């Protein structure tokens, strides 16, 4: 998602920087949301788009979820306060809803069932607290994507489609299960669009 987002920003009128723990790209500046001192690098930004997260089923120790997703949110908000950055876009997850009912909208109850959903929920609360300190002069956009798929991805969606294409897919039951998915370019395009939002609190599934 980050790469697609950056590619779309390059085609826009925005000046932007890429901040990451992976600095293999020569234009990337090292920033770790767990390290508040490294976040000083973003002090001149007018919009923060936080895509950083820990999301794997085999994360050890479990506290890594809290370190990145929760403490990272605290650090991002603190740097925004320190330098008067008034716009934050945060990619959360539909995992905050847990096993939600069909047609659950942005006002649905949070019934997370794992540490990923729990820490995304807590991060949302931290960002909301930051916004509510000065709601008339701050913008917060929370995006809750479902499974993101697209070219170059080798995750579960790719594996599923690959098995179907090779006629190796084994279906259990009647095959009536439905899965929500989001195309990576659509999510990236929305993030660019969200950079132009007015002050306020905006949440999107």
Which role does the model predict for each range below?
Residues 1-47, 51:
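N-terminal Rossmann/SDR dinucleotide-binding element
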Residues 75-115, 133-138:
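Conserved Rossmann-fold NAD(P)-dependent oxidoreductase catalytic core, especially the SDR/UDP-sugar
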Residues 125-151:
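Conserved beta-loop-beta element that borders a ligand/cofactor-binding pocket
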Residues 153-159, 173-196, 202:
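Substrate-positioning beta->alpha
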Residues 33-71, 75, 79, 96-99:
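NAD(P)H-binding glycine-rich loop region in Rossmannoid oxidoreductase-like domains
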Residues 64-75, 110, 114, 118-119, ...:
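Glycine-rich NAD(P)-binding loop of the Rossmann-fold in SDR/ketoreductase-type enzymes
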